[in-house]
A protein has these predicted regions:
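N-terminal small-residue-enriched
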Residues: 1-445
Length: 445
């Protein structure tokens, strides 16, 4: 690979490409899914590809390959030149010059990579068995999944930059259905971790069973205004679907109402929103972004005040600011976009139970669905199917389902009254505690 990249760079220079970058990614992944104690899906893949981009006659061109021979060199160079000639975007930023120290981060866990496929299958089967045997009302277990992967990224460019990292990750997820007379309840739970021990059978299986059983005998509440608390994981889903409004790329396309509001108050004083790619154990952690820019922590919203958009080199150049190092490619062949890393709401000091006792009565939303159809990131409006439970004097009362909770995310940020201390990152890079958002409209019976 070293010789191939060197040959590619030399060929690009000889062809008149002014500057260029090779982005190499490799992925060694495993996935197994079980249903009712049987393995129904099994995948083990090793893939490697190279994305190549270069500035030719003032325009950026793109090409990619999964072949690494002499013929591929010529195809990549020609592909970049042809792509650049068709490009109408004149706002491309120059490639990163490679300056600045790269944080020393160890994202490897060789022990995870050495776990055998059978050991992984045994783990997901053990989790499923635990759920099934936890209560006679558990009727079915399905879509129980274990994933593991080892991923390597290497970026080399014509400015002399050559940096790489490798990470090991895994995830364990379970789902179940319970029956009690005419009542049926389904729920799921999962964890992501950088170690095999982090894929805890008792934790995942116990939570799947508890959440599924907690939903039995659920019913809608009467329609009206309710004091609403989003449970941490439901709040993560909500923040995740609206995270793009904090992207400079989105704002520059006129698709974020935060455009032009840096320095203004956009949220309640208790709201602080951070993007931290240096977080130990974070699923979004990385030493540099997908343009090679060293990672750094940024406070996006501080005590309710909007401090910065998230940027890559292109958006930063357009706004006349420094990049925040949040460039991301969804694959080696994709264009560069802006994406948060470990993006989270800073937690408060009180536990969820203490916060609920302080509120008195209301509705806790534990799950939301229909996020893509029911949420509009441009306007901020949302209307989502939800599950949860009512509470009084801080104590859980009745399970709730088949309701719709509606509001506006921009208004919700300003309406936040308190954040609990239970910060969690459910399965990825979005983290939230449980949040008291004041009153929202709920449609039920």
């Amino acid at each position: 690979m070293q010789d191939f990249v060197k040959q590619l760079m030399e060929a690009a220079k000889a062809a008149g490409i002014e500057e260029c970058e090779a982005y190499v990614s490799s992925r060694d992944s495993f996935r197994a899914m079980t249903t009712e104690g049987e393995v129904v899906e099994y995948e083990s893949n090793l893939t490697r590809g190279l994305g190549f981009r270069g500035l030719y006659r003032g325009r950026m061109g793109y090409a990619s390959t999964e072949a690494f021979d002499e013929e591929a060199v010529g195809q990549l160079v020609r592909g970049v030149m042809e792509s650049a000639e068709l490009c109408e975007d004149e706002d491309e930023a120059p490639l990163y010059d490679g300056g600045g120290p790269v944080p020393d981060m160890d994202l490897r866990n060789p022990a995870l990579a050495q776990v055998t496929p059978q050991e992984k299958i045994d783990r997901v089967l053990a989790m499923e068995k635990l759920v099934k045997e936890s209560d006679p009302r558990i009727d079915k277990t399905a879509h129980n999944v274990i994933n593991t992967g080892s991923y390597t990224v290497r970026i080399v460019n014509s400015h002399g930059m050559d940096r790489s990292y490798t990470e090991d990750v895994g995830a364990l997820y379970g789902q179940a259905t319970a029956k009690d007379g005419d009542f049926v309840s389904s729920s799921g739970y999962g964890v992501a971790a950088r170690s095999f021990d982090g894929l805890d059978v008792k934790k995942v299986g116990g939570e799947v069973a508890r959440r599924t059983l907690d939903g039995l005998n659920a019913a809608p509440v009467p329609s009206g205004k309710y004091r609403v608390v989003f449970f941490s994981e439901a709040m993560c889903d909500l923040l995740g679907v609206f995270s793009s409004i904090f992207s400079a790329e989105t704002a520059q396309k006129g698709m974020s109402l935060l455009k032009g509001r840096v320095g203004e108050r956009i949220a309640a004083p208790c709201v602080t929103l951070v993007d931290d790619p240096l977080m130990e154990g974070g699923m979004g952690s990385r030493p540099f972004d997908d343009e090679g820019v060293p990672s750094a922590t940024h406070t996006v919203v501080e005590d309710g005040v909007f401090r910065t958009f998230l940027h890559n080199l292109k958006t930063a150049r357009k706004d006349g600011v420094a990049t925040t190092g949040k460039a991301r490619k969804v694959g080696y062949a994709s264009a560069v976009h802006v994406t948060p890393t470990n993006f989270y709401l800073k937690p408060g000091k009180r536990t969820l139970d203490d916060m609920l006792r302080g509120i008195g009565e209301g509705l806790v939303i534990t799950e939301v669905s229909g996020l893509h159809a029911g949420a509009n990131p441009i306007s901020g409006d949302f209307s989502l199917l939800a599950k949860g439970y009512t509470f009084r004097e801080g104590r859980r009362e009745k399970p709730v389902e088949q309701i719709t909770v509606a509001g506006n995310f921009y208004e919700l940020l300003s309406a936040v009254r308190e954040l609990a201390s239970d910060l969690t990152f459910p399965m990825g890079g979005i983290g939230c505690p449980s949040v008291d958002v004041g009153e929202l409209s709920v449609s039920g019976t």
